[in-house]
Amino acid sequence: MKHLAIYPGSFDPLTKGHLDILQRSLGLFDKVIIAIAVNSNKSTLFSIEERLGFIREVTKGMKGLEIDTFQGLTVDYCNKVGANSIIRGLRAVTDFDYEYAISLMNKKLAPNVETVFLMSSGEYSFISSTIVKEVARHGRDVSNQVPEIVSKALLKKLSQ
């Protein structure tokens, strides 16, 4: 049986913390789908096309990886593509409380889908897309927290 996992998120923007979780996930599963959530009720800095472009560029050459977008519930997307696992990265205990509650609901909705929690590597444990955007808005360098293509796009977008 193939083990297919999805790694869902808005990835607005993609961070080095996301990439850390992704690379480690690729060692655990036969295939991982980065599933970019499209939520019309959520305001994003980067369009879905921009986020897809960043992820495609940064993950070029990674084996066992697919990139897709989805709307609706994560477990419905899992069932649609035949995934049996959802990957979630955890930075701190506060992340766990929130993610654990969601994983319990997901289990009720789709008993066949497991949530796999991966702790962030220490050097990425403080990084979040929200914090990166806030720091960049104030003109500070975020190149240690995001891939180069994202850092350049942030500078360009926030200087407009």
Swiss-Prot record:
Segments crossing the lipid bilayer: none
Annotated signal peptide: none
Coiled coil, from the record: none
Amino-acid positions noted as binding ATP in the UniProt annotation, renumbered to this chain: 10-11, 18, 89-91, 99, 124-130
CDD domains: PPAT (cd02163)
EC number annotated for this UniProt entry: 2.7.7.3
GO term, biological process aspect, one: coenzyme A biosynthetic process
Pfam families, A to Z: CTP_transf_like
Predominant location category: cytoplasm
Pathways involved: Cofactor biosynthesis; coenzyme A biosynthesis; CoA from (R)-pantothenate: step 4/5
Catalysed transformations (reactions): (R)-4'-phosphopantetheine + ATP + H(+) = 3'-dephospho-CoA + diphosphate
Residues at which substrate binds: 10, 42, 74, 88
Cofactor: Mg(2+)
Top-level EC class as recorded in UniProt: transferase
SUPFAM superfamilies: Nucleotidylyl transferase
Cystine bridges: none
Entry GO CC: cytoplasm
InterPro entries in the cross-refs: Cyt_trans-like, PPAT, Rossmann-like_a/b/a_fold
Annotated compartments: Cytoplasm
Keywords: ATP-binding, Coenzyme A biosynthesis, Cytoplasm, Magnesium, Nucleotide-binding, Nucleotidyltransferase, Transferase
MF GO annotations: ATP binding; pantetheine-phosphate adenylyltransferase activity
Function: Reversibly transfers an adenylyl group from ATP to 4'-phosphopantetheine, yielding dephospho-CoA (dPCoA) and pyrophosphate.
Similarity comment: Belongs to the bacterial CoaD family.
Quaternary structure, from the entry: Homohexamer.
Name of protein: Phosphopantetheine adenylyltransferase
Natural source organism: Leptospira interrogans serogroup Icterohaemorrhagiae serovar Lai (strain 56601)
